[in-house]
Protein backbone atom coordinates (compact mmCIF):
# COMPACT_ATOMS: atom_id res chain seq x y z
CA UNK A 1 0.00 0.00 0.00
CA UNK A 2 1.30 3.40 -0.95
CA UNK A 3 0.16 6.85 0.15
CA UNK A 4 1.97 9.92 -1.20
CA UNK A 5 1.05 13.40 -0.01
CA UNK A 6 1.97 16.31 -2.30
CA UNK A 7 5.10 14.48 -3.44
CA UNK A 8 6.77 15.36 -0.14
CA UNK A 9 5.80 12.59 2.28
CA UNK A 10 5.16 8.95 1.49
CA UNK A 11 3.81 6.06 3.52
CA UNK A 12 4.25 2.44 2.55
CA UNK A 13 3.08 -0.66 4.40
CA UNK A 14 0.02 -1.61 6.38
CA UNK A 15 -2.17 1.44 6.17
CA UNK A 16 -5.54 -0.31 6.21
CA UNK A 17 -8.56 1.81 7.07
CA UNK A 18 -11.05 0.19 9.47
CA UNK A 19 -11.63 -0.10 13.21
CA UNK A 20 -10.03 -3.56 13.43
CA UNK A 21 -6.70 -2.21 12.13
CA UNK A 22 -6.37 0.26 15.01
CA UNK A 23 -7.55 -2.38 17.52
CA UNK A 24 -10.78 -0.55 18.26
CA UNK A 25 -12.59 -3.74 17.23
CA UNK A 26 -11.05 -7.23 17.30
CA UNK A 27 -11.77 -9.73 14.54
CA UNK A 28 -8.53 -11.73 14.80
CA UNK A 29 -7.26 -10.69 18.20
CA UNK A 30 -4.79 -7.81 18.49
CA UNK A 31 -3.85 -6.57 14.99
CA UNK A 32 -0.11 -5.97 14.48
CA UNK A 33 1.14 -4.21 11.35
CA UNK A 34 3.92 -1.93 10.15
CA UNK A 35 4.27 1.12 7.94
CA UNK A 36 7.17 3.38 7.05
CA UNK A 37 7.08 7.14 6.50
CA UNK A 38 9.51 8.51 3.93
CA UNK A 39 10.59 12.06 3.13
CA UNK A 40 12.99 13.30 0.48
CA UNK A 41 13.98 11.75 -2.83
CA UNK A 42 12.64 8.29 -1.96
CA UNK A 43 9.12 9.74 -2.17
CA UNK A 44 9.66 10.25 -5.92
CA UNK A 45 10.19 6.50 -6.29
CA UNK A 46 7.00 5.77 -4.35
CA UNK A 47 5.13 8.19 -6.60
CA UNK A 48 6.42 6.43 -9.73
CA UNK A 49 5.56 2.98 -8.32
CA UNK A 50 2.03 4.19 -7.60
CA UNK A 51 1.60 5.83 -11.00
CA UNK A 52 2.87 2.75 -12.83
CA UNK A 53 -0.02 0.77 -11.36
CA UNK A 54 -2.61 3.55 -11.71
CA UNK A 55 -4.95 2.79 -14.62
CA UNK A 56 -2.66 -0.07 -15.66
CA UNK A 57 -5.37 -1.51 -17.91
CA UNK A 58 -5.80 1.64 -20.00
CA UNK A 59 -3.94 1.95 -23.29
CA UNK A 60 -3.21 5.70 -23.13
CA UNK A 61 0.24 7.15 -22.56
CA UNK A 62 0.53 9.09 -19.32
CA UNK A 63 3.11 11.77 -18.63
CA UNK A 64 4.14 11.51 -15.01
CA UNK A 65 6.23 14.66 -14.74
CA UNK A 66 3.34 16.72 -13.43
CA UNK A 67 3.13 14.46 -10.37
CA UNK A 68 6.80 14.72 -9.45
CA UNK A 69 8.31 17.45 -7.30
CA UNK A 70 11.65 19.12 -8.09
CA UNK A 71 14.66 17.34 -6.64
CA UNK A 72 15.67 18.94 -3.36
CA UNK A 73 19.33 19.66 -2.80
CA UNK A 74 21.13 19.55 0.49
CA UNK A 75 19.44 16.48 2.00
CA UNK A 76 21.55 14.58 4.51
CA UNK A 77 22.82 11.33 3.04
CA UNK A 78 25.43 10.22 5.53
CA UNK A 79 23.09 7.59 6.97
CA UNK A 80 22.60 5.83 3.65
CA UNK A 81 19.99 5.64 0.94
CA UNK A 82 16.41 4.46 0.74
CA UNK A 83 15.47 2.83 -2.54
CA UNK A 84 11.82 1.79 -2.77
CA UNK A 85 11.19 -1.07 -5.19
CA UNK A 86 8.18 -2.99 -6.45
CA UNK A 87 7.25 -5.74 -8.85
CA UNK A 88 5.62 -4.61 -12.07
CA UNK A 89 2.87 -6.05 -14.25
CA UNK A 90 4.89 -5.03 -17.32
CA UNK A 91 7.74 -7.53 -17.03
CA UNK A 92 8.53 -10.97 -15.64
CA UNK A 93 11.07 -9.77 -13.11
CA UNK A 94 10.42 -10.70 -9.49
CA UNK A 95 12.24 -7.73 -7.99
CA UNK A 96 11.06 -8.35 -4.42
CA UNK A 97 12.05 -12.01 -4.49
CA UNK A 98 15.49 -11.14 -5.92
CA UNK A 99 16.06 -8.63 -3.11
CA UNK A 100 15.21 -11.31 -0.54
CA UNK A 101 17.55 -13.85 -2.19
CA UNK A 102 20.35 -11.27 -2.20
CA UNK A 103 19.84 -10.52 1.50
CA UNK A 104 19.70 -14.20 2.47
CA UNK A 105 22.82 -15.02 0.45
CA UNK A 106 24.82 -11.98 1.59
CA UNK A 107 24.16 -11.50 5.30
CA UNK A 108 26.47 -12.61 8.08
CA UNK A 109 24.55 -12.33 11.36
CA UNK A 110 20.79 -12.53 11.13
CA UNK A 111 17.68 -12.28 9.01
CA UNK A 112 14.34 -11.73 10.78
CA UNK A 113 11.15 -12.12 8.77
CA UNK A 114 7.60 -11.29 9.80
CA UNK A 115 4.83 -12.33 7.43
CA UNK A 116 1.17 -13.33 7.64
CA UNK A 117 1.42 -15.57 4.58
CA UNK A 118 4.42 -17.92 4.43
CA UNK A 119 3.81 -19.46 1.03
CA UNK A 120 7.21 -20.25 -0.46
CA UNK A 121 8.56 -22.07 -3.50
CA UNK A 122 11.37 -24.62 -3.28
CA UNK A 123 14.06 -22.08 -4.16
CA UNK A 124 13.11 -19.82 -1.24
CA UNK A 125 12.83 -22.77 1.16
CA UNK A 126 16.29 -23.96 0.13
CA UNK A 127 17.75 -20.46 0.48
CA UNK A 128 16.23 -19.96 3.96
CA UNK A 129 17.57 -23.33 5.14
CA UNK A 130 21.01 -22.77 3.57
CA UNK A 131 21.28 -19.41 5.35
CA UNK A 132 20.33 -21.00 8.70
CA UNK A 133 22.77 -23.88 8.23
CA UNK A 134 25.57 -21.44 7.42
CA UNK A 135 25.23 -19.91 10.89
CA UNK A 136 22.95 -16.99 10.12
CA UNK A 137 20.14 -16.60 12.64
CA UNK A 138 16.98 -16.95 10.55
CA UNK A 139 13.77 -16.19 12.46
CA UNK A 140 10.28 -16.16 10.98
CA UNK A 141 7.35 -14.69 12.93
CA UNK A 142 3.88 -15.78 11.83
CA UNK A 143 0.39 -15.09 13.18
CA UNK A 144 -1.13 -17.63 15.54
CA UNK A 145 -4.63 -16.42 14.63
CA UNK A 146 -5.10 -16.44 10.84
CA UNK A 147 -7.23 -14.15 8.73
CA UNK A 148 -7.06 -16.50 5.73
CA UNK A 149 -7.39 -20.10 6.92
CA UNK A 150 -6.12 -21.62 3.65
CA UNK A 151 -2.92 -19.52 3.63
CA UNK A 152 -2.39 -20.48 7.28
CA UNK A 153 -2.78 -24.18 6.50
CA UNK A 154 -0.35 -23.95 3.58
CA UNK A 155 2.19 -22.07 5.73
CA UNK A 156 2.04 -24.77 8.40
CA UNK A 157 3.10 -27.38 5.83
CA UNK A 158 6.52 -25.65 5.61
CA UNK A 159 7.17 -25.47 9.36
CA UNK A 160 8.70 -28.94 9.85
CA UNK A 161 11.19 -28.67 6.98
CA UNK A 162 12.23 -25.15 7.96
CA UNK A 163 12.65 -26.00 11.66
CA UNK A 164 14.65 -29.13 10.83
CA UNK A 165 16.84 -26.92 8.62
CA UNK A 166 17.64 -24.57 11.50
CA UNK A 167 15.09 -21.82 10.86
CA UNK A 168 13.37 -20.61 14.03
CA UNK A 169 9.62 -20.08 13.71
CA UNK A 170 7.53 -18.18 16.23
CA UNK A 171 3.83 -17.40 16.27
CA UNK A 172 2.40 -14.14 17.57
CA UNK A 173 -0.30 -15.43 19.94
CA UNK A 174 -2.23 -12.30 21.03
CA UNK A 175 -3.66 -11.86 17.56
CA UNK A 176 -2.87 -11.40 13.91
CA UNK A 177 0.44 -10.28 12.41
CA UNK A 178 -0.29 -8.50 9.13
CA UNK A 179 3.20 -6.98 8.89
CA UNK A 180 5.52 -7.90 6.04
CA UNK A 181 9.01 -7.24 7.40
CA UNK A 182 12.45 -8.46 6.29
CA UNK A 183 15.27 -7.18 8.52
CA UNK A 184 18.93 -8.14 8.27
CA UNK A 185 22.34 -7.29 9.72
CA UNK A 186 22.61 -3.97 11.51
CA UNK A 187 25.54 -2.75 9.42
Language model segments and positions:
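Charged, low-complexity intrinsically disordered terminal segments
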Residues: 1-187
Amino acid sequence: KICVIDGMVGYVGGVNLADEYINKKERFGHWKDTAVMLKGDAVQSLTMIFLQMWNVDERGVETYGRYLTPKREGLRRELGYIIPYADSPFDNENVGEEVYFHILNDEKKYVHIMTPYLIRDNEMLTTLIRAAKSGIEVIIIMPHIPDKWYAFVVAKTFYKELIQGGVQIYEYTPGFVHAKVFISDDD
